[in-house]
């Protein structure tokens, strides 16, 4: 910023704390999400297969508690979790959500997929077992895409205690009896892990912000920078 001021590109260099003050504004969150989605748009003609996953970012805020067993205070850094959907060809993030670390992955998939389908023709959705549910299978099928989500070891034809579901049973049979073909598609899911590795390698695996809103916005900024860099 000081360099930009020296070159006459801006009249006044703002305080280095200005960015952190803006990050604390909750109105910035939907704007950052929209920018992430818009920045992915130029790759509409390239991406058709998408992977979903989540990853944690460490904060500088700590939980502290007294350990009665050992008679001393203990502390542990709090984490926040980024949920993303990305194209498996270019690693572009097409939608993102940031939540508390204990938030489950499966309920995040519908919104990630819905926002991705606003700009992309989705043909395949890849995700790990954490996303396995009847609801997610039907949501993916409803947009004309095929789900490649492995089943948990205790999965049965009755859909985890629910009434018999045709799509669940079809995909379970496909997974069990066409495992090789399933895996040729599913292996592309590893690209979402590569996406998180790229983001953390370039922009850091932790956040400096102290407040929850600012932490969410800081992670969204990392994802946005990944898309445009």
Model-derived segments and spans:
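Catalytic-loop motifs flanking and including active-site residues across diverse enzymes
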Residues: 108, 191, 195, 220
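Residue-level detection of the helix-turn-helix DNA-binding "recognition helix"
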Residues: 2, 24, 28, 229
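Polybasic low-complexity intrinsically disordered regions
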Residues: 12, 16-144, 223
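Charge-patterned, long linear interaction tracts outside catalytic cores
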Residues: 198-229
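Helix-centered, glycine/charged polyanion-binding patches within enzymatic domains
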Residues: 130, 134-201
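Residue-level "edge-of-site" marker
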Residues: 17, 153, 213
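DNA-recognition alpha helix
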Residues: 1-9
